[in-house]
Amino acid sequence: PMALCEPCQGIQRNWRKAPGHAELVQRGNRKEDRDTGPVTITRYVCDRCGTAWEYENDKSNQKAGWSVVGR
């Protein structure tokens, strides 16, 4: 598998409100239940390197945010 491209390497993981980058293409979202209530998880794929990301939007968890989910 190829490495993360430079813009993907620059994404701060697991931090609320950290920005993505311009070449991420949204691929839909889903709801999941957490102890504090439902959260929205949005899936993205990088146009440049093909990395699949998810962004978890949880207002009560500062450490929810970007994570790599596949290639």
Where are these regions (language model features)?
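Small disulfide-bonded, cysteine-rich extracellular recognition modules and tandem repeats
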Residues: 8-11, 56, 69
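Short metal-binding segments enriched for Cys and/or His
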Residues: 33-62
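Short, structured interface segments that constitute the first stable element of a domain
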Residues: 1-2, 42
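Short recognition patches in nucleic-acid-associated and regulatory proteins
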Residues: 2-37
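A short, surface-exposed interaction/processing loop segment used at functional sites
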Residues: 62-71
